[in-house]
Amino acid sequence: VKTTVYGLFLCLAAFLAVTLAGNPADADELVRFESAPVKLSPFRISKAREQGEILSQPQGTPLLGYLSRPEGDGPFPAVVLLHGCEGMRLSIKELWPQRLVAWGYAVLVVDSFTTRNIQDTCQTTLPDRVFDAYGALNFLSKQNFVDIRRVALMGFSAGGTATLEGTKIEGNEQLMDHKFRAAVAYYPVCAASQGDATVPILILSGDRDNWSPAERCRQRLARLSDDSPPIELNIYKGTYHDFDAPEFKVGRRVLGHIEKYNPDVAEKSIRSVRLFLRKYLSN
């Protein structure tokens, strides 16, 4: 009997060791962190000193996120995900993290809305999203299983727009302690005024998307200097907004724009993302 009990104890111990060693590959953990604070400029600090004032450093906004990681100790390359103007949805909170973890990446999905009591930003803007992305990067820099030198930023729709804003030359990126290595933007709103990029970027758009017109992305690419990191633009024919999201198998119209899943194009885009991340985060 003692032998049997001891054997059961060893089995249980082995089971717990496997279960508790890190996070399982298909699980996510609710984490809390802050958006990157808006740093005080040297000029503002200098003027305050001249007037005998002491300025306190601004604080970031408290945020929630969902952290997933492959099994093992790492350090792993990682991807920060930014949702669109409608907030969290299945494909961003679950499907993309599962996919990326299976490819060997740690993933942090940023929830920009819950702590701000925001439902959506489809008719407004939230410029703080860029600071949310860098707050997530700061959080990942403190995780010993993440290789902070190999982190990509990836956003969808409004999150894709924030991704482009957060990786443009002479933008807020230059004020941040940590930098992204690459960026992926699904159906973002591009602007020629965004200029050169600070990292290689992959943009994926549909030619029937009138919410995030691909033509604007073409215009930006046409104005890149020879010194800019490469921006790859994939435009898919006959494709609308949210083409990678199975939630929209039945297309719907929102604010005059069509959201519709396209499984064939989704698979093509997923393959492009995998190759792009492998190219720029491999070492």
What kind of region is each of these model predictions?
Residues 160-174:
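Short glycine-enriched nucleophile-adjacent loop
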Residues 26-73:
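N-terminal cap/lid segment of alpha/beta-hydrolase-fold proteins
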Residues 123-144, 165:
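Alpha/beta-hydrolase active-site loop
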Residues 203-205:
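Short beta-strand/loop motif that positions the catalytic acidic residue
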Residues 199, 213-223:
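Short alpha-helix in the alpha/beta-hydrolase fold that links the catalytic acid
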Residues 230-283:
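C-terminal catalytic histidine-bearing segment of alpha/beta-hydrolase fold enzymes
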Residues 74-76, 81-119, 210-214:
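Short substrate-entry loop that stabilizes the transition state in hydrolases
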Residues 146-157:
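Alpha/beta-hydrolase fold nucleophile elbow
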